[in-house]
Every structure is written in C-alpha cells, then in structure tokens.
Amino acid sequence: MSTSITVRNRDRSLPPLLLPNVSLLEKDIRRKGTQNVGITDPELLSTTWTRKRAFPTDELLGGYKRLKPAAADSNECAIGIATVTPPPTLPVSAIVPPPQNYTPPLFEYHPHALASMVNEDANASCTQMSIISRSTSNSTTSSATSTSSISKRQRSGPSCDKCRLKKIKCNAKIEILLQDDTIMPMISNKLRYVLTPDDIRLYRGTLLRNIAIPDDVIEGTGSRKLIKHIDKLVLLTPCLPCIKKKHSSSSTNFPKNDKCTFSKGFTRADINISSKISLKFKDKTIYDITYDDYKSIDF
C-alpha cells in the first residue's frame, strides 16, 4: 500500500516553485555529508531512502506526475508543487445585456413528434403500396374473370340453330348492312328472304346503291349470303361447323340450301319479335311469315 510523503521546501535560497534535484542531492550527500543541503527531513537525509526513492532523470522529464499539494501548516503557508492559472475572464462591465425587445428563438425538439412523423410516412407508403398492390390484383382478377367469361361465352350475339342444338361455339359472322322500316315490304313479301344474284343486280342501282357487296355474293359463288330479315339487310358468313357439314341433317324444318340458319333472328330484338310471332302463328316458321302477318301483331 503506497503512502504519500509530504515534501516541504524550506530552503529559502531556492525559487519558491522549484524542488531540489534528487540525483544532485545524492551526490552532495556522498561528497559532503548531510550538511549544506536544503533538506531537513530525517527520512530524506538517509542515503538508503535517496537510493530507493530517487527517480531517473528520464522519468522526471518524460512521465511527469503532479504531486498533491502539502497541507497548510499552523505557522506558515504551504507552497504547492504547481499552480494552474485560470483563463482570463471578461469584466462584468464588458457584458452587454440584450435589448428589451429581443426575443430569443425557440428551438424545440420533440422526439415523439418526429417519431410520429416517421411512422406516418411509413404508414402512408405502406398504405400506398397496399392500394397499388390491391388495385393491381383487382385489375388482374377482373381481366382474368373477363377473359374467362369471354372464353366460356359462345359469342356476343345468338348462335345458329345447329350450333345451339349441339351446344358448341358458333363463329358465324353477322354484318348489318342496312336497317330501315321501309325495306320491310320491299324485295319480297316475306319477313325472311335470301337474295339471289338476280335480286342483287336488280336492286343494285336503287336500294343497294350505297352498300358495298362482295363479288362472291353478287356472283353467288361463295358461302356468304345477303339476307333480308324484317327491317334489315344482313351479310351472313356461315360458321365453320356448318361449312364443313359436321352436323347431321336430321332437321328438316329449314330449307336445304340454308346451311347456317338463325330461325329466331340475328339480334336480341329479333328474338323478342320472333317469340311474339311464334305465339300467334304456331304452325308457321320465320320463312313463312309475311309482312301482313307482321302488321297484324300488336308490338
């Protein structure tokens, strides 16, 4: 256990803040004895202590440690080993007070508010991402649903009689070239009439003047037909099953030359009219109904 040793400088010939060099004191003790030395403490006068407690010059110069100041004596003031000069301070008169109207700025730091703002930004971004992902999934689901519904549905309009009977998809193409009530009594008295090449040449300068009709229809060499149905002229392209004759010819209610037939009409309005006609004229088909029969029905 180390003990502190109080060192007092009683040699008045030395400067007040300097201590005697211990190594020099040891040489003087060997040469002259214990006289003429400014150390009066018996412990310091012993040669054994100086040998044991003497510090090398390198240690004194390199790793210098400040000793504790000696305690105050009853008769004289203790002289400290070292004193620290405090930094100069401004006089009281040099401090200028702030003006009366001066208001210091307030800088308030609210960690909870900052955390809440960060949380709100994170929640907003998460909400936006969830909305985007939800809208994307909804659009994907709706597109998939619409695609599946379109693929499952046979066609946008009615199917031909044979495809409806076989419950297969009908790819017949229906083009309405002209629709007007004035054409109902024209060309033929029948509500359903298939125009021949002679009929097309006859009405090409009047009724069919502004209608583009394909050459194969005019010449009668193709499978497409120009049909008058109630108040419209329809260009019908037969479906592929009817063209390939994959259906059986068990049905004898329709003419043999009309392979792809639409007995109930080509539009949904035609189906409504056909259902009313069939209720009143049960023994007639759409090919037998005349314009007079049509006028006798109250639509």
From Swiss-Prot:
Protein name per the record: Sterol uptake protein 1
Coiled coil: none
Subcellular location: Cytoplasm; Nucleus
Homology family: Belongs to the SUT1 family.
SUPFAM superfamilies on file: Zn2/Cys6 DNA-binding domain
InterPro entries in the record: Zn2-C6_fun-type_DNA-bd_sf (IPR036864), Zn2Cys6_DnaBD (IPR001138)
Broad class of the protein's primary localization: cytoplasm
Keywords: Cytoplasm, Nucleus, Transcription, Transcription regulation
Biased composition (Low complexity): 133-151
GO cellular component, one term: nucleus
Subunit relationships: Interacts with SSN6/CYC8.
Other remarks in the entry: Present with 1100 molecules/cell in log phase SD medium.
Effect of a null allele: Leads to increased expression of NCE102 and PRR2, when SUT2 is also deleted.
Role played: Transcription factor involved in the induction of hypoxic gene transcription when the cells are shifted from aerobiosis to anaerobiosis. Promotes exogenous sterol uptake and stimulates endogenous sterol biosynthesis. With SUT2, positively regulates mating by repressing the expression of the mating inhibitors NCE102, PRR2 and RHO5 in response to pheromone. Finally, regulates filamentation via the repression of genes such as GAT2, HAP4, MGA1, MSN4, NCE102, PRR2, RHO3, and RHO5, when nutrients are plentifu.
Gene giving rise to this polypeptide: SUT1
Record's signal peptide: none
Organism: Saccharomyces cerevisiae (strain ATCC 204508 / S288c)
A GO biological-process term: positive regulation of transcription by RNA polymerase II
Region described as Disordered: spans on this chain: 133-160
UniProt-recorded Gene Ontology molecular function terms: DNA-binding transcription factor activity, RNA polymerase II-specific; RNA polymerase II-specific DNA-binding transcription factor binding; zinc ion binding
CDD domains xrefs: GAL4
